[in-house]
A protein has these predicted regions:
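Clamp-loader machinery-focused feature within the broader ASCE/P-loop NTPase space
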Residues: 2-186
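Phosphate-binding Walker
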Residues: 40-41, 202, 217
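Active-site catalytic pocket residues across diverse enzymes, especially alpha/beta-hydrolases
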Residues: 50, 54, 195-198, 243
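Conserved catalytic/switch belt of AAA+ P-loop NTPases
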Residues: 165, 189-205
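A short beta-strand-to-loop transition that corresponds to the Sensor-1 phosphate-sensing loop
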Residues: 179-181, 206-211
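Short regulatory helix/loop adjacent to the ATP-binding pocket of P-loop NTPases
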Residues: 186-196, 210-223
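Long, charge-dense, solvent-exposed interaction surfaces that engage phosphate-rich ligands
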Residues: 224-260
Length: 260
């Protein structure tokens, strides 16, 4: 997933790039956008950029006995400089070991409370690949939830704490992308200390639709990134590029889509 794959929101993309390239990246961000805004694919594209940065230069002893980096390269590189890398290919396939996901799910068995997001990782990867603009209903259909409601459980929160306490594998950074933190309920309070005092180079990216349903204690610890719905002309342009339809038809569809 790249920024170019996400419809519209040029200003948001530019803001995110500036945060990264100017080394002003906060440790917790909340991407807030209505269904159809592209908040999830945009967050995913941004997460990929973070974990695919080249490893920091090693430090060596200088002439005065201090430790200095071999290179004074900037901490973050522009997307154009990393999109051909092996790590970017892994991230694009959603298999990079330092990119972690958390999302609503149902227990594998009705009486089993040990289920975690990782138990659905294969389905989740397929969902993101095939339906990056999908909604909660679409996802619950994929995992055959039937009439059961998905949530993010206490067990899942403990698993997040465990995963993020480990060192990164290939990147300088670890990123947790959590979709729909509205479904954390009070269990999310287990994450507060980790969000407030994360291990070095650990980034939380929350993707939400309804600000009012997010725990205030989590909301207050995040930098808010509002994702508006794409404009009609942006939807029209995307349809012409990706759907291979006539210009007039693209214009009509964009007009009635209301950005969705």
């Amino acid at each position: 997933m790249t920024f170019n794959d996400v419809i519209g929101n040029k200003n948001v993309k530019q803001h995110l790039l500036e945060l990264m390239l100017q080394n002003r990246l906060p440790h917790a961000l909340l991407f807030l956008g209505k269904e159809g805004s592209g908040a999830l694919p945009l967050a995913l594209a941004f997460a990929q950029l973070i974990i695919c940065q080249p490893k920091s230069s090693p430090v060596v002893e200088d002439l005065f006995g201090g430790m200095s980096a071999i290179s004074n390269e900037p901490s973050f590189l522009h997307p154009n400089d990393i999109e051909s890398s092996t790590s970017y290919s892994k991230a694009n396939l959603l298999v990079h070991p330092d990119l972690h996901f958390s999302f609503p799910f149902i227990n594998k068995k009705n009486s089993d409370s040990s289920t975690i997001s990782a138990d659905y990782i294969t389905e989740w990867r397929e969902f993101l690949m095939q339906s990056p603009y999908g909604n909660l209903y679409d996802w619950l259909q994929v995992i055959k939830a039937e009439n059961r409601q998905g949530n993010i459980s206490a067990k899942e929160c403990l698993e997040i704490i465990k995963k993020l306490s480990l060192k990164s594998f290939e990147s300088d950074y670890k990123v947790l992308l959590m979709w729909l933190p509205e479904l954390l309920s009070k269990e999310g309070n287990k994450l507060l200390k980790l969000i407030e005092e994360p291990p070095p180079n650990t980034i939380f990216i929350f993707v939400a639709e309804n600000e009012e349903k997010i725990l205030p204690t989590i909301l207050s610890r995040c930098q808010l990134i509002k994702i508006p719905l794409p404009e009609n002309d942006e939807v029209e342009e995307a349809l012409l590029k990706k759907a291979n339809i006539e210009p007039e038809q693209a214009k009509q569809i964009a007009a009635i889509s209301n950005g969705n």
